[in-house]
Amino acid sequence: MPDALPPCSILILAGGRGQRMGGRDKGLVDWQGEPLIAHVHRVVRPLSDDLVISCNRNQAAYRPYADRLVGDAEADFPGPLAGVIAGLRVARHGWVVVLACDAPLVDRELIEGLLRLAVTGNSAAMVRQGGFWQPMFSVLPKRVLPVLEQAWAAGERSLQKALLREAVQGLECAESDRRLSNFNSPDRLQD
């Protein structure tokens, strides 16, 4: 296993409708005095010189947290698969860390563990928690872009199903692992 990890791009998905947040843009919702995106940014900024945020609104608010912003090719918030495709298209490195904007407890150890697993297996790596895949915590080789584009063209809209068309390494995490907490509803902001 290599000691040094290769350069990676970071893709933060912030392009959703925020339905469980009453339509509010989740990445910009305050938690502990800062927008959720600021918490994620603080962890990932030292890990990459290529930080991309997929957002479909509020670009001016996200700009300070990214090197580049991308939007979905289709209107009406088509889902995380569209955001991943858009992000992979502009990523500068061969490995891309994919994270949600509403996961402020993610840490460097988890990200580096996923990256190491992906590089060692020369394939995508995704968190598995309690037997379930968690595609919002993954590392993808940029070369999976055509597979995801083909899945999209065939009508697939599930990021997880599209990713599982290829070999994926699973990083097992406990069900109680707080690093995987998604703050995707108002009651979660009280945690």
Curated annotation (Swiss-Prot):
Catalysed reaction, written as an equation: Mo-molybdopterin + GTP + H(+) = Mo-molybdopterin guanine dinucleotide + diphosphate
Gene3D superfamilies attached to this UniProt entry: Spore Coat Polysaccharide Biosynthesis Protein SpsA, Chain A (3.90.550.10)
Main location as per UniProt: cytoplasm
One of the record's GO molecular function terms: metal ion binding
InterPro entries associated with the record: MobA-like_NTP_Trfase (IPR025877), Molybde_CF_guanTrfase (IPR013482), Nucleotide-diphossugar_trans (IPR029044)
Class of this enzyme: transferase
Entry domain remark: The N-terminal domain determines nucleotide recognition and specific binding, while the C-terminal domain determines the specific binding to the target protein.
UniProt function note: Transfers a GMP moiety from GTP to Mo-molybdopterin (Mo-MPT) cofactor (Moco or molybdenum cofactor) to form Mo-molybdopterin guanine dinucleotide (Mo-MGD) cofactor.
Designated name of the protein: Molybdenum cofactor guanylyltransferase
Organism the protein comes from: Pseudomonas putida (Arthrobacter siderocapsulatus)
